[in-house]
Every structure is written in C-alpha cells, then in structure tokens.
Amino acid sequence: MKLPIYLDYSATCPVDPRVAEKMMQCLTMDGLFGNPASRSHRFGWQAEEAVDLARNQVAELIGADPREIVFTSGATESNNLAIKGVAHFYAGKGKHIVTSKTEHKAVLDTCRQLEREGYEVTYLEPMPNGLFTLEQIEGALRDDTILVSIMHVNNEIGVVQNIAAIGELCRSRKILLHVDAVQSVGKIPVDVEALKVDLLSMSAHKVYGPKGIGALYVRRKPRVRLEAQMHGGGHERGMRSGTLPTHQIVGMGEAFRIAKEEMVSEGQRIMALRQRLWDGIKDIEAVYINGDLEQRVPGNLNVSFAYVEGESLIMALKDLAVSSGSACTSASLEPSYVLRALGLNDELAHSSIRFSMGRFTTEEEIDYAIKLIRDSIGRLREMSPLWEMYKDGVDLNTVEWAHH
C-alpha cells in the first residue's frame, strides 16, 4: 500500500490506463493525429471516425442520440453554454431561472452573471438532508420561468436528487430543465429519456478520463435551441466552435464505455467500501453524516467531527488525500456554502471532511484510513478546550465569547 492514500475521487480521478492507451494512439505521426474537420484526406477521415465512435460511446451511457452530444472543454463550459445559451435564446419568452443554493459554482456564478444582465434567479434552499421537494420547485415556477437548473448528484455531500419527478414537472409546464450530472454519470444509471431532461452537463475527468474535455447533451425532440457562446468555424453543429481535440474525445469515449460496462459491479464494491469506512468511524462521539445516507451516490461520505477544526484535521490526516469541500473552493478558509445551506453552523461546517472513494481504492486503504482518523480525532480533541467544555456539560451555544 502506497501513501498518501487518495480519497478525493470527487475532485478528480486518475486516468484509467486503458483510457491513456487509447489516447496515445491519437497523437503522433503514426496515429490518428488528423483534424476531424479535414474532409479532403484520410488523416481527417480517420480522426473523424474516432470522434464519431467516442460520440456514440458518450451517448450510449446516458441513453441519448449521438447527434445530441456537443463536446466542450469540460463541465464548467457545458454549464455556461446550457444556462447562458438558453437564457439568451429564449429571452423573449421570459427572464426567470430557478436553481438551488447547493449547485456547483459553475452554475451559481453563471446565474449571477445573468442577474447582472437583467435576468431574475430564484435560489432554492434544500431540506437539512440536502434534498429538494417537488412542491418547493413547483412553488418557485412562474409564468416567465424559462429554465430550471438542478444538479443530479451534489459534489460535496453526494445526495441524489429525484430528477425524473422534476423533469416531469418542468415538461408539464413547458419549462426547460438543465441538469449538472458531473457526479452521477458513470456512477449511477442516467437515462435522459427516463429523467426527462433537456440539457445535461458531463465531464470526463470524474469518470477516469482526461481533464479538459466534457460534453453537453442537448435534446433534439422536442428541440432545444441554444445561443452559441464560442464562435468560429461552426463545429459541433454551430453550438461550440473549435478544432476537436481527438485524443481527449477518444479518451472520454473509452472512459464512458468502461463506466457503462463496470458500473453495477464497481458501484457495489465502492458502496461496500463506503459502508466499511462509515462503520469504522460512526461510533466516535459527536460525529455526524452530512446529506441523506439512503439517496446517495456510492463513493461519497461527508462527515462532521464536532469540536475539531477542519484544517487541523486535514493536516493530521496528511496520509489521506481528502478535502473539506469541493476542490474549487478548497483554497478558501470559508466554511462550505453547501453545508451552510443545509443549516449547519460555521463550527460544524468547518469540521467536515469529504471522503470519496473510487475505482482504485482498496479495503486495506480504508482500514488504514479508519485507524488514522480514530487516532487523529482522539489526539486533536484532547488538545481542544471546546471538547473539554463539552465533556463538562457546558452548552457551547450559550457561551458569550469575548470579541477582541
């Protein structure tokens, strides 16, 4: 077993060796290095064929038509293209968007930008378990609502929203539904027909593919129209210009093919690892799980260890690669906005750790992690005056702290 142990699969995954192998065949003179848009020679045709195969592999994982797949530079671009693209195209119909406070920054900041352009956005607050009720979403819809954007699986707490019901509601009201499915695709079944979504964002690097490539599913029937955000040679049916990076697209296709093949067996194995980790730490005093434990993606465990400072815990767990929020916000010392939205106070939000396991995680690594966590929590709490007060029966919420 090698240290440190990687338990941050929700931030990114290593590329599967089978994927890397396929990618290497698209780079050099003796490979498929041509421009897929070059129609006048074999180098272009072969590259185009490789891209077509990958487009099919991506479509197959989510039950889509390959013509509904638009390749992008990643899910951030997919989210921007979906939300801004719809908002600008349908501005004549209305300027109201519904989303949630627990979305990824790529959705929240895109909506903030649209607010600056004169759009109105409603940000829904989740229940304490991280889920939304259909009534909540229905209550936010207005006559001028053009788009609902709700993520399938949350990147911090791993809860799975009931997208099919939301899709049914949106369709009955003739409102478009965009879903950020970065954390669900390849991990749990995603079928765009069953979920009734109109737009769906995906990323390769959360499914053991390369970074820098993603896709946006754009429904054809009934047709969803978008205003392009990237202009140029009219690639991807005019929705996203730019020379297609054959090697990255091929990598994404192969990664999605493997995910489809191994989803059930891997899901069960990873679920067992998560259960093993939780069983190993749940009897520690004052430990809380964040997000619904039933409606949850297999590889995610987000836990708050009360009376321990998150930063010091991460330092103590230096042999474990874990995070205290999303990677994108991990550099800030602010408590997680997702956990705050669930109603956690600053202290508990600060003492939370996200463990996410994946394809290369082993039982041996989990057992090592359990021992390390137990030892570290014990040691850090011994040094904590707050823990001492708690053990003495002091209600810390009633303490008046002196402010300097």
UniProtKB/Swiss-Prot annotation:
Q: Record's HAMAP family?
A: Cys_desulf_IscS
Residues recorded as binding pyridoxal 5'-phosphate, renumbered to this chain, are: A75, T76, N155, Q183, S203, A204, H205, T243
- Mind naming one GO cellular-component term on file for this protein? L-cysteine desulfurase complex
Gene from which the chain derives: iscS
The cofactor required is:
pyridoxal 5'-phosphate
Record's function text: Master enzyme that delivers sulfur to a number of partners involved in Fe-S cluster assembly, tRNA modification or cofactor biosynthesis. Catalyzes the removal of elemental sulfur atoms from cysteine to produce alanine. Functions as a sulfur delivery protein for Fe-S cluster synthesis onto IscU, an Fe-S scaffold assembly protein, as well as other S acceptor proteins.
Q: Which residues form the active site?
A: C328 (cysteine persulfide intermediate)
Describe its partners and assembly state. Homodimer. Forms a heterotetramer with IscU, interacts with other sulfur acceptors.
Q: Which is an annotated GO molecular function term of this record?
A: 2 iron, 2 sulfur cluster binding
This protein's pathway reads:
Cofactor biosynthesis; iron-sulfur cluster biosynthesis
So what does this thing catalyse? (sulfur carrier)-H + L-cysteine = (sulfur carrier)-SH + L-alanine
Residues recorded as bearing N6-(pyridoxal phosphate)lysine in the entry:
K206
Q: Where does [2Fe-2S] cluster bind?
A: C328
Q: Give the family, as the similarity comment puts it.
A: Belongs to the class-V pyridoxal-phosphate-dependent aminotransferase family. NifS/IscS subfamily.
The protein depicted here goes by the name Cysteine desulfurase IscS
